[in-house]
Every structure is written in C-alpha cells, then in structure tokens.
Amino acid sequence: MNKIIAANQTLTSEAVSEGHPDKIADQISDAILDEMLKVDKNAKVACEVIIAQNLVVIAGEINSPVKKNIDIKEIAKNIIKDIGYTNIDYGLDYKTITVIDAVGNQSRDIINAIEKEGSNTLGAGDQGIIFGYACDDTKNFLPAPYELANSILKKASNLRKSGAIEWLRPDSKSQVTMEYDKNRRPIKIKNIVVSHQHHPNISQKLMRQTIIEEIIKPTIQDKSILDENTTYCINPSGNFVIGGPTGDTGLTGRKIIADSYGGFARHGGGAYSGKDATKVDRSAAYMARYIAKNMVAAGISKEFELQLAYAIGIENPISIQITAGINDPKYASKILNFIVNNFDLTPNGIIEKLKLKQPIYLKTCTYGHFGKNEFEWEKLDFVKKIQTVLKK
C-alpha cells in the first residue's frame, strides 16, 4: 500500500473483551439478529442497544411477520449471563436488570428501496463506504499487533470462565505496540497494555505477575518477538474493580476499529453488529475482506485494501478502488477489472456467496469479525484463479 513506514517505526492496535460494555451491546444486538433469522431468513433487522448501570434499552427496527415469536428481553438476559455478569458487584447482574424493548418497524420507504416490486434483486439497504483489508503479517492475514491484542483477551476470558483465575471479572481491554522494519515486517513487541477488571482483594503485584506469566507469555508463540526491552502496562490506572456498565455506558457499534483491522486499514464508519445482510455496511465489508485476503494469499501484494461504495436502493456498487502498493497503473487496472468481472458485489450476490442468511452473527462480534476461519469470507478458494490470471 502507499504507506511510508520508517525503519523501526511502531504501530499499535487495541482489542476489547466480550465483557466490555460496548461489546455487551454488540452481542445482544447480534443475538437478536440470529434469533430473528432462525424464524425468518428474510427478516430485516437493525438492532441497537444501550446499556448503562443495570439498565438495557433495545431499540432499532425489525421487519418480519414473525417478529413477536422471539423474546427480546430474555435474549438480552441470557447474553449477559453467558458473559459472566452474574453479580451486581461485577457491574451488571442478569437476574436484576431492567430491559426496555423499544424496537419498532422498518420504514416502508427503506423496504421499497431494498425490495423492488416484481424483481428478485435487492438494492443496497443504505449508502455507505466500505473497506476490506488483508496483510501477510500472520497466517490469518491480519495485522500482528491486532491479532495478538485479541488473542491475549481470549486467553484471559478462557481462564476466567474455566475458574483457573477466579479473581478475573468480565470487563477488559488490551493494546499491543509492535516495531516494524523498513520492509513493513513486524520484528518485535515494544509494549503490551492489559487493563482487566478484578476482585477488590487482589494485589497489584499478583495481578501483574499472573497476567504476564499466565496470560500474555503463553499466548505469544513466537518468543523471538519478546525481549528484555518489551514493557508491560498491567492495569496502569491502578484498581479496576468498578467495571462493566456501572463503570462505563455501552453502545452497539462503538468499537468499529477493534471489530475490523485495528487501525491498519481505513474505515467508512458503518458498524457491523445488529444489521442483517441487506445492510452493506456489514455484508460488503465481509465480501471486501474475502477479496483482499485471497489477493494477499495469492501473492499479489503484501497488503491489500479494497474500497466499495453503495447508494441506497442501487444494486451494484457505485465505485470500487484498490490500494495495494502497486506502481504499475496497467497492472492495477487489470486487478480492478478482475474484481469487477469475477465477484458479484450486489447484495444478493454477496448474501448467496457468503451464506449470510444463516444465524451466525453472534459468533462474529467478539474478538474481531475477521480471522475466524469458520466463516465463508475467510476461505481461500479464489487463490488459484487469481494466480492464474493475475500473478506476474
């Protein structure tokens, strides 16, 4: 890509756990979407959640003749329970929360824009600028600090839920800073930040030692990227006892960089969670990731970013742009033409290719929407064709 990377420059990404207030909101939104898709694969869903103190407000729009078949309030309580908020001392308690259902119906104007009368095609559910990205930092084609930041929190979550570290509580964040060489290769970790909610009786010394030795170090498989100069900031604010929605209000769609590529790629601003696949903010972002990942895996570029733009009610994207550090304009045009001619970028085409009418969304929304190989947009089934047509 057209980035200037100085030798020994540091790049940083952050992640949040499933117990972070914004992530609680995302999970409730996507759990509601999944439950709707189980009873109506064509349901139109735009679900937003705000969570503060011991109150959950569920808003947005759902269009389905069987909307009343799901219990939105019970879905929210079950998500909060599964995360581990089982005691008000943790900042939230599924047993005592108040849940307000303020979900309405989707606008008839929007429905008419998406579903054209007498046509089987779908228009885009909204306008939007969407980006997909991949790089060769890791085997999952994600930025190294971003992948590590998420892996650290996943490890912590597993140890918390298994009871191996009983004093951990659900809310946490991480941040990883890596040093890159002049060829944009990650060479070592400069700094790791972990802020993790905890029981009030745990000492800072024990917390630091446990998080470094039992969570961080076992997570990092390549020990060569750690050295004596790596610094650790473990709960740098001091105590982190007051957490969850008691400490910070949560809102759907507020962690768009942690959801995508950790700041390594551009972002159009549209969040993913709570939206069915007619909303191109989500579905086209998954498709753009699929294309970018296959391009990098095919050896076209070390990193690849694809921009798509849509207009509401219009089937095809109104613009397509690639950014891949390719200095040959003719070759760049060839790549762009290949994308246009080989990938169906309409909402219908994306939904069919990526199987987006399935109730898969709750699994997508924690620890990043990308890099999870169970999903269709992570498959590398286009690599051979790309290499045959485009590889120099």
UniProtKB/Swiss-Prot annotation:
Location (main, coarse): cytoplasm
The enzyme's E.C. designation: 2.5.1.6
Requisite cofactors: Mg(2+); K(+)
Pathway membership, UniProt: Amino-acid biosynthesis; S-adenosyl-L-methionine biosynthesis; S-adenosyl-L-methionine from L-methionine: step 1/1
Chain positions covered by the region annotation Flexible loop: 106-116
Record text on cofactor binding: Binds 2 divalent ions per subunit.
UniProtKB keywords: ATP-binding, Cytoplasm, Magnesium, Metal-binding, Nucleotide-binding, One-carbon metabolism, Potassium, Transferase
Enzyme kind, highest EC tier: transferase
Subcellular location: Cytoplasm
GO cellular component: cytoplasm
Superkingdom assignment: Bacteria
Residues where ATP binds: H20, D171, S172, K173, D248, R254, K255, A271, K275
GO biological process: one-carbon metabolic process; S-adenosylmethionine biosynthetic process
Chain residues that bind Mg(2+): D22
InterPro entries for the chain: ADOMET_SYNTHASE_CS (IPR022631), S-AdoMet_synt_C (IPR022630), S-AdoMet_synt_central (IPR022629), S-AdoMet_synt_N (IPR022628), S-AdoMet_synthetase (IPR002133), S-AdoMet_synthetase_sfam (IPR022636)
Binding site for L-methionine: E61, Q106, D248, K279
Catalytic activity reported: L-methionine + ATP + H2O = S-adenosyl-L-methionine + phosphate + diphosphate
Positions bound to K(+): E48
Subunit structure of this chain's protein: Homotetramer; dimer of dimers.
HAMAP family in the record: S_AdoMet_synth1 (MF_00086)
Main function: Catalyzes the formation of S-adenosylmethionine (AdoMet) from methionine and ATP. The overall synthetic reaction is composed of two sequential steps, AdoMet formation and the subsequent tripolyphosphate hydrolysis which occurs prior to release of AdoMet from the enzyme.
NCBIfam families: metK
Family membership: Belongs to the AdoMet synthase family.
The protein's name in its UniProt record: S-adenosylmethionine synthase
Record organism: Borreliella afzelii (strain PKo) (Borrelia afzelii)
Gene designation: metK
